[in-house]
């Protein structure tokens, strides 16, 4: 019985190492892509500029849209108090945030209360979208990591 449990533990350890290695190789490449080429991002806050609110009028003439800025990073869209009369939308470039792109590239993060979110994208004017969709590059790793961690915890607690 001990050798069977040991073999399963070793298999899970190898699987975790492989996933970690692939993540280590893959994530810096996507982060670097986001940081090395210039894109245009909308720069506005719906608190002071109604043009920034959702739904965003991306078909309006450029003079009737919020200002664009050159960005050497990713575009960001933050929503606070979503689906309430106090909803605030802010669109900007990551160069204005104290944030590590290694952690957030291609990700939408939800506020713990569920009343807001922050999304990152890397195409021109992509932060105009009402629903930024991630490309799912890293998202598939989250359930795998959770499952492996749970299994390892179960095996080690026996």
Swiss-Prot record:
Show the propeptide residue ranges.
128-158
Give me the Extracellular side stretches, as residue ranges: 33-135
Which region ranges are annotated with the description Loop 2? 77-91
Q: Quote the cellular component terms of the Gene Ontology held in the record.
A: external side of plasma membrane; membrane raft; plasma membrane
**What's an example GO BP annotation here?**
rhythmic process
Signal peptide positions (record): 1-32
Family matches, as PANTHER family: ATILLA, ISOFORM B-RELATED-RELATED, PROTEIN QUIVER
Protein name from the UniProt record: UPAR/Ly6 domain-containing protein qvr
Taxonomy of origin reads: Eukaryota, Metazoa, Ecdysozoa, Arthropoda, Hexapoda
Q: Which gene encodes it?
A: qvr
């Amino acid at each position: 019985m001990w050798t069977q449990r040991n073999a399963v533990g070793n298999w899970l350890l190898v699987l975790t190492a492989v996933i970690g290695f692939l993540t280590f190789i893959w994530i810096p490449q996507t982060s670097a892509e986001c940081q090395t080429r210039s894109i245009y991002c909308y720069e506005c806050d719906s608190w002071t500029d109604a043009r920034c609110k959702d739904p965003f009028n991306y078909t309006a003439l450029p003079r009737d849209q919020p200002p664009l800025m050159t960005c050497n990073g990713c575009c960001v869209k933050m929503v606070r108090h979503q689906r309430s009369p106090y909803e605030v939308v802010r669109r900007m470039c990551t160069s204005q945030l104290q944030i590590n792109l290694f952690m957030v590239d291609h990700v939408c993060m939800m506020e713990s209360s569920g009343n807001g979110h922050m999304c990152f994208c890397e195409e021109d004017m992509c932060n105009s979208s009402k629903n930024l969709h991630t490309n799912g590059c890293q998202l598939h790793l989250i359930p795998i990591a959770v499952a492996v961690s749970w299994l390892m915890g179960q095996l080690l607690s026996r």
